[in-house]
């Protein structure tokens, strides 16, 4: 198991500077993380800097509220792919889910999957805002829409991933869809809890700290 390939090394703060983007790119190269996850404005630059590495470029769509129109999310996705994004992390229409407008939620995801043209799509359901049944339903809709991952959180809604939610999501989607845990995964202990619960991708700004913990761990 290559632990570094679980990590999307993430910097999504609105005030992120080019210097900070350079830092996470350098760290991702040094540790050979799966990807760097950056806001769309940084995608082209990140893709150019990572062209000679295995590290992928991940970006976010309809982020962080999920309240953009479906057409806007589709355009954002097309633009990101054109600029060099390899993976797309989109936010669902959370209000539509709570309304019970499940067709709208699924069609929103499907539009992004179509616009991504075969690139990996991860669907952020914002678990902290959902109850048990809503987490199950959002996970089911993600699977039905043909996305690759269901993801816990944006990190912007006041809460992050829990092992309980990750397990519920994994139990719901089964083997066909993977689970990404993000938000509040800060160290080796958090990382292990998420992986044991079924996550195969971890979104974290603390990728280096996690890896240093792994390197210091006698079981690694």
From Swiss-Prot:
The keyword Cytoplasm applies. One of its GO terms (biological process) is deoxyribonucleotide catabolic process. Its EC number is 4.1.2.4. It is found in: Cytoplasm. GO terms for molecular function: deoxyribose-phosphate aldolase activity. The keyword Kinase does not apply. It catalyses: 2-deoxy-D-ribose 5-phosphate = D-glyceraldehyde 3-phosphate + acetaldehyde. Its main location: cytoplasm. Pathway: Carbohydrate degradation; 2-deoxy-D-ribose 1-phosphate degradation; D-glyceraldehyde 3-phosphate and acetaldehyde from 2-deoxy-alpha-D-ribose 1-phosphate: step 2/2. The active site is at 89 (proton donor/acceptor), 151 (schiff-base intermediate with acetaldehyde), 180 (proton donor/acceptor). GO terms for cellular component: cytoplasm. Keywords: Cytoplasm, Lyase, Schiff base. Catalyzes a reversible aldol reaction between acetaldehyde and D-glyceraldehyde 3-phosphate to generate 2-deoxy-D-ribose 5-phosphate. Belongs to the DeoC/FbaB aldolase family. DeoC type 1 subfamily. This is Deoxyribose-phosphate aldolase 1.
């Amino acid at each position: 198991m290559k632990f570094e390939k679980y990590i999307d090394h993430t910097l999504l703060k609105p005030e992120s500077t080019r210097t900070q983007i350079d830092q996470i790119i350098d760290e991702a190269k040094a540790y050979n993380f799966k990807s760097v996850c950056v806001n769309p404005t940084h995608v082209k630059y990140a893709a150019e800097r990572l062209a000679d590495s295995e590290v992928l470029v991940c970006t976010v769509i309809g982020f962080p509220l999920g309240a953009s129109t479906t057409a806007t999310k589709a355009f954002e996705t097309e633009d990101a792919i054109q600029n060099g994004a390899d993976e797309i992390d989109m936010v669902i229409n959370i209000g539509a889910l709570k309304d019970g407008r499940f067709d709208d939620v699924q069609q929103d995801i499907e539009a992004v999957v179509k616009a991504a043209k075969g690139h990996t799509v991860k669907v952020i359901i914002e678990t902290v805002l959902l109850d048990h049944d809503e987490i199950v339903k959002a996970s089911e809709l993600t699977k039905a829409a043909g996305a690759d991952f269901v993801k816990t959180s944006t990190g912007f809604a006041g809460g992050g991933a829990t092992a309980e939610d990750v397990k519920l999501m994994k139990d719901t989607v089964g083997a066909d869809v993977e689970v990404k845990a993000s938000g509040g995964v800060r160290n080796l202990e958090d990382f292990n809890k998420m992986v044991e619960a079924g996550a195969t991708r971890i979104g974290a700004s603390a990728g280096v700290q996690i890896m240093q913990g792994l390197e210091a761990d006698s079981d690694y």
